[in-house]
Amino acid sequence: MPLNDNFVYCPPQEPLVLVYEDDDLVVIEKPAGLLSVPGRLPEHQDSAYLRVLARYPQAKITHRLDMATSGILMFAKHRDAEVAVSKMFQARTVTKHYIALVQGKLDGEGKVEVPLITDWENRPRQMVHFELGKPAQTLYQGLDYNAETDISRVLLTPITGRSHQLRVHMQYIGHPITGDKLYHPEPARSALKRMALHASYLAFTQPLSGTAVEIRGQVPF
């Protein structure tokens, strides 16, 4: 949740977009501004999970996206599927790609490998800490660059799944994600009124059926 005590939660009300479903799994596209799971306060209950639960009463969330991040979010329809998907994520056999707009010219390919830890004095911020942080790795690939706005479009592939990993790693290498009010509060030159980070791709072998699944979402920026 944002650090600002004056934060008012106003989640988007458009229906969730269903992008994949089988006997065990359901995958939706979460809009930016919607929590993945309910918050502690009554006014923070509206979330992707509760909306999915209304249609699939046994659904379990398998991973999360930050409120400001949009994109592909997967749920298990029942307990056996939840356990199987959890093992799949632990084994790192799921491929996830994100598209982001970042400040500055970032071209070529590279890897960010710096450990992360919660910044307890400024929660929910995370920070780089080489002594106490947990290992975190992110691959990046520059896709294009807009010289007029000084903004690059990049493909991000998280190898690990630390909280705020992509956001902190991009900030660390000097290319913060545009619109990120937590890690890049300066006025961004992007015309977007949101953080430019979208979970665009998910690929895995369905753990119960053995079917190869590849899901591509529509990037809204």
Residues covered by each model-derived region:
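Pseudouridine synthases involved in rRNA/tRNA modification
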Residues: 1-25, 31-35, 148-149, 163, ...
